[in-house]
Regions:
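Post-DEXD/H (motif II) to motif III coupling segment of the RecA-like Helicase ATP-binding lobe
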Residues: 223-270, 285
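SF2 helicase catalytic motif II
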Residues: 161-164, 171-241
Length: 442
């Protein structure tokens, strides 16, 4: 898997910024020089001034729409960043994710030697790559000063596993004395790098001493004071944020327009938005539209195209009152309309009908997925064509994130029918519709 055109431009932007950091006297001058080279002012109507929230380490963001291949670009960035850092340091990456579902997904893809993400890392580091979970690190499983010196070490962890104020016992272990890591303590030369009031053998001390590159996936979730403290506690040498919806104080070095993704057939655009007057009509029309798209998909496959089974993603309301359109009510309505139960899956914080399912498989029957917030980010399925929202969301970030779940283009290729190259949204919420229109037009 090779970088496409817009991804190559993002890599060029990163390299240009790293050059400015190495030439500059501080992070503020590097930021000004980088944007000056693009004829863009800093402040005064230009890009915002550099936000120096992480002590002594460059902290920048790539703004890439959902479906744009952020994770692959992050993998391609690692070699570039290490090449720009002082030589002789251990090559360690701490890869942070916001949820358990994304954690599992990231560990799986980075560990799979046949997956493009891992193949990119293997290509750039001559196959000498180790991927570790928090549990593996705590147990010292193939994790020692020797292995760290010899290979790229990628530590995949959740934000929550590093928050120092956590009351969870398994989280606090990161900050506790650990006999499995005593060999690392023998190598600590810079005692100023150690965290105060924390044992030398604690995992957090080991990571601080290694001064890792930190990759922050879905970084719009890591802007609180606690999250900033978490990042500073890692004593990073570089922080790379990945998100489609950066916060205002993000140091964005590269912007990718959704139209660039369309050119590369990465996403289903345009997004067609339908506003309905009742919740019942949202559900009925979503069923009918999905059926029409599936007929097009069957005809396209018969003419030599790829297999596609269109899916509707229903966004239900949280259980706040008797009139709430909760996931169980929506499922009951679908069944009453003649939809077989084996075509319906629920994905919430408590129910996970998607576990173990390969939605891209011809053997899978699922055509309707009902969620509340569990699929807001970090999940997408190219077969998801229709978002039917019964929730009254007004947050631009939340709406853009849920919209992103249906944008990825099946097989990253143009299909013969326009219906198969388009995403669809149905809603009966005026607030959701208004927020969505701003995103689509913008």
């Amino acid at each position: 898997m090779e970088l496409n055109n817009y991804q190559k431009q993002v890599m060029r932007d990163l390299s240009a910024y790293l050059d400015c950091v190495n030439r500059g006297t501080n992070l503020f001058s590097a930021w000004r020089e980088y944007w000056f080279s693009k004829d863009v002012a800093v402040g005064l109507g230009g890009v915002p001034s550099y936000n120096n929230s992480i002590e002594r380490a460059p902290h920048v963001c790539m703004k890439v729409p959902t479906g744009g291949g952020k994770t692959f670009m992050a993998c391609a960035s690692v070699r570039r960043i290490f090449d720009a850092l002082p030589t002789g340091k251990p090559q360690v990456v701490v890869w942070l994710v916001p949820s358990d579902s994304i954690l599992t997904q990231t560990i799986r893809t980075l560990s799979d030697v046949d997956h493009p993400y891992r193949q990119r890392l293997d290509q750039d580091f001559a196959g000498r790559v180790g991927v570790y979970t928090k549990e593996m690190l705590l147990n010292g499983q193939n994790f020692s000063p020797d292995t760290v010196r010899e290979m790229l070490t990628v530590c995949v962890m959740s934000y929550g596993s590093l928050r120092i104020d956590s009351r969870k016992k398994d989280v606090r272990k990161v900050y506790q004395e650990n006999g499995n890591l005593f060999r690392f303590a023998e190598y600590f030369k810079d005692t100023q790098a150690l965290l105060a009031d924390t044992p030398d053998t604690a995992l957090i001390q080991v990571l601080r001493h290694l001064e890792p590159i930190v990759v922050v996936d879905e970084s719009h979730n890591a802007e609180s004071k606690l999250s900033t403290e978490m990042l500073n506690n890692l004593n990073p040498s570089f922080v790379l944020d990945l998100t489609a919806t950066p916060r205002k104080n993000s140091n964005i070095i590269s912007y990718v327009d959704a139209r660039e993704l369309k050119k590369e057939h990465m996403v289903k655009l345009p997004v067609v938005v339908y506003n309905r007057t009742t919740r019942q009509s949202v559900i009925q029309d979503a069923i009918q539209l999905r059926g029409s798209i599936e007929q097009e998909a069957i005809a396209a496959e018969a003419a030599g195209g790829k297999y596609i089974r269109p899916i509707v993603l229903f966004q239900a309301q949280p259980r706040t009152g008797e009139n709430s359109d909760t996931f169980d009510k929506i499922k009951a309505m679908l069944v009453s309309m003649g939809i077989p139960e084996n075509q319906i899956a629920v994905k919430t914080s408590d129910v996970d009908d998607l576990k173990g399912q390969n939605l891209m498989s011809r053997a899978c029957e699922i055509r309707y997925i009902i969620t509340v917030n569990a699929l807001k980010e970090g999940w997408d399925c190219p077969f998801a064509y229709i978002l039917a929202s019964l929730a009254n969301r007004t947050s631009t970030v939340d709406v853009e994130q849920i919209l992103g779940r249906i944008l990825r283009q099946p097989y990253a290729m143009q299909h013969s029918s326009p219906l198969l190259n388009t995403s669809y949204v149905l809603t009966n919420s005026v607030d959701f519709h208004t927020t969505l229109e701003k995103i689509v037009v913008g």
